[in-house]
């Protein structure tokens, strides 16, 4: 497979070695062998995967358009109408791509895939809710809730006990003040709890919508015959070498 200019097609393989990051990666890897860098980007330009491989490791047969690996470890599929080097893909690679891009169709030929989406458990969101600021906010709110809840309960109970004692000594003004303080305290606590809970519920709903486990439902007829493609590729290479010799 030869590399060309950067195409930036959504869901396609983008060969781009111009940035400093790629040059650094190439220098740190196997310096003695020619290499190429491929990228998979989303619609908004977000980098979803980067593959740096030596040219000598390429397979003569069909390869996955996402990871550039052959069909030795996992069989290749042709689930859409794309042809050529973009027509074959690993099932697991395509599932990760659909999950990351939050789509259910091919970005190139717009073929709709039959997929089953399963939401991830809430425990995964608690472990990794997303960006760093969201992690910090969730942690701080949980700590504040654990401290403020017993503090508000004890403060309210003490205020009510004080109001009861003042009523016994006919100090109605102090009793009314303590009751009003208790009501204000619990009102602020309930409002803060509801606002924080609603905010984190919205974050969780968005995370659950964009971080689903995608299962690709592919019929057997869509399986790419890897052996057949390998034999066909070998025949083409052999015929090309014969023509070159002649």
Curated annotation (Swiss-Prot):
Example of a GO MF term: zinc ion binding
Membrane topology recorded in Swiss-Prot or TrEMBL: Multi-pass membrane protein
GO biological processes: endocytosis; protein ubiquitination
Cellular localisation: Endoplasmic reticulum membrane; Lysosome membrane; Endosome membrane
Keyword tags: Endocytosis, Endoplasmic reticulum, Endosome, Lysosome, Membrane, Metal-binding, Transferase, Transmembrane, Transmembrane helix, Ubl conjugation pathway, Zinc, Zinc-finger
Reaction catalyzed: S-ubiquitinyl-[E2 ubiquitin-conjugating enzyme]-L-cysteine + [acceptor protein]-L-lysine = [E2 ubiquitin-conjugating enzyme]-L-cysteine + N(6)-ubiquitinyl-[acceptor protein]-L-lysine
Name this polypeptide is given: E3 ubiquitin-protein ligase MARCHF2
Gene name of the record: marchf2
